[in-house]
C-alpha cells in the first residue's frame, strides 16, 4: 500500500506540474465506497465466488478508487491510472507485483492525417460487454453475471477505425489472453478479438464483440470462442432499455470437436422519474452447465436467474448515491447459508460514487 500511495502521489504531482505548461494533459479521479449486506451471512464476508466487483459482504469498503492522467495532442495519446479497492484485489490476484494496481496504462498513435485510424498498445478496458468497472457509468450499481465473468481489462495492441461522422467504429485486437496483463506460463498462443459498434443516432448504440483464444498450457490447451452483442436504446429522455446476449464455446479437450457452451441474456430498464432521480430493473439468466467460467460440481451446473432493482440519486452531475436489491435463483443448490446448501442468494448494496 505504501508503494501504491507513493506511486499515486508521484504521478499526480508530476502530471499536475506538467499540466501547467502542457494543457493537453488532464488528471482525473474516481472513488466508490460501498456497503453490501448478504442475507446468507457468509462467515468469510465474501459474496458468491462468481462476483468480483462489490464482492465484500456485511462491511463498508472501497470498491474502486483511481487517479488517472491522460495526454492527447490529437495525433498522440496516452493514459495511465493507478487504483486500489476490493475490485483490484478480486480481479488482479494473478498479476505480479505492482501490476495489481494498474487500472489503465496505454499509448496510441494516429496512423492517418485524414482518417480516424489509431493504433494503441498497453493495458486498457475490455472490448466485451456494456458494463465496466466504473459503476457510476452503468445503469445499475452491481454488474451482471456475464460482465463479472468476461474480462474487465485486457492487455495487448489494437487498431481502431472510426468514421468521420462518429456513427461506426471497428476495432481489431491482439491480446495476451482472457483478462491477463502477463501471458500464461506455458501457453505460447496469442489471443485476439473484434469489436464493431454502430450509433445511428445519439440515442441508439448497437455493438458486437468477440474473442478467440486458448486456455491452459500448450500440451492441453483448448480453444475458447466468445460472442457478445448488445443494444442500448434511449427511447425517450426519461426511459431507456439495454438488451444483451452472450454466447461462448470452449473445447472439452485439446483436439476434440466436442464443446462446452455458456449462454447469458440480460435486460435492463431505466426510468428517470425526476431530474436527479432514476430507477432501474434488471433480469438476467446465466447458464454454464459444464463450468467453463463458473464451476459448481453439481448435476446441472450453473443455471441461475438474477433479478435486481436499483434507485439512484445524483445531487450533482459528478456524484451518485445508489441503493440496489439483488436476488439470485439457481436450479441446483450452489449457494451456502448457515452451513447448508441452498438455491437462492439475496443482497442489498449501497454506494457513493464520485468522479473528479
Q: Where does each model-flagged region fall?
A:
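Outer-membrane beta-barrel architecture
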Residues: 22-28, 75-79, 116-118, 167-171, ...
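Glycine- and aromatic-enriched membrane insertion/assembly motifs of diderm outer-membrane
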Residues: 54-86
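Surface-exposed coil loops of outer-membrane beta-barrel proteins
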Residues: 34-60, 88-104, 112-197, 207-214, ...
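Residues on the lipid-exposed face of transmembrane beta-strands in outer-membrane beta-barrel proteins
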Residues: 29, 33, 58, 62, ...
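Outer-membrane beta-barrel channels and translocator barrels
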Residues: 22, 72-76, 112-114, 126, ...
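Outer-membrane beta-barrel pore domains
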Residues: 51-54, 88-93, 98, 132, ...
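Bacterial Sec-dependent N-terminal signal peptides
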Residues: 1-23
